[in-house]
Amino acid sequence: MNIGNNNLVLSKYPAAIEKHPDARRALCFGDSWFQYVPHPTDLNKQIARLFKRTLFLREGVAGRDSAMWKAALPRIQREIGTFGFDAILLSNGGNDIVGEELREFVKTAAQPQSTGAGPWGEIPPEVFDHIRLETFEHALRYAIKDMKEVVQMRDLLSRDTIIYVHTYDYIFPSGKAFKLGPFTMGPWVKPFLDNVGLTDPKGQRVVTSWLVDQFARALRAFVSQNANMRLVDSRGTLKTASQWENEIHPVASGFEAIAKKCWKPALTGVLE
């Protein structure tokens, strides 16, 4: 089966299914890790290259936040009900955990702390001093809730479809922004931590790694509570700052490494 271009927008997807009715089908719904403009390097594109006999419906949007996620849900529900996907790949939560939303739950060491009800275990001093734990707990809950809505749609319309979620990776708070010509986004992390008095690079990495670990913990619990869900744990894949183009996006070889080392084993047997 020679599909050719297998990473498609909605307007081209029905014709591709008609031409290749036996091909596997996957929906990629998420953020800039699934649609990193203008680079041909993001996870969606890397995974499509690995599974050339699968038709991928491209629903990634750079900078997608919770409001944008919710706005897309009616269309996503129609797609799930119409196309009978073998797999749904979700990329969500990064902006809520170590992106723009970080400014909502950082604090100075002098400001009061409320730990909330999260199962934090041992909390690093840098985290206790500079993260509003109760507020972060709410951010985690909202990120999971957004994904849960897709799971509920799947349960209603296509119960055998397998849903995949992922952990991102440990970032380096470098202060590097995303740049495209005159357009700049970010940086997302270092300025927020600097502003609350956490300026030590090692301390900043302690905090951001802990945040990613807590997101992974919440995802693991979420996956364990739902049938036909799998967690792709990509933490620790990218070990150096040079593997990151900016604070929250890997370079091309970084996306490729995550796709090959983490996503390919998880998807093999479901996609082709």
Language model: regions and residue ranges:
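Hydrophobic, aromatic-enriched interface-forming segments
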Residues: 139-189
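Short catalytic/ligand-binding loop motif for oxyanion handling, primarily in non-cytosolic enzymes
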Residues: 35-38, 96-100, 171-181, 239-242
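Short N-terminal or domain-adjacent regulatory/targeting segments
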Residues: 1-22
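Surface-exposed cleft-lining segments at the edges of enzyme active sites
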Residues: 118-145, 150, 201-208
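Acidic carboxylate-rich catalytic motifs and surrounding loops in phosphoryl-/glycosyl-chemistry enzymes
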Residues: 60-63, 229-243
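Substrate-gating cap/lid alpha-helix
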Residues: 174-230
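Histidine-centered active-site loop/cap adjacent to the catalytic His
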Residues: 242-272
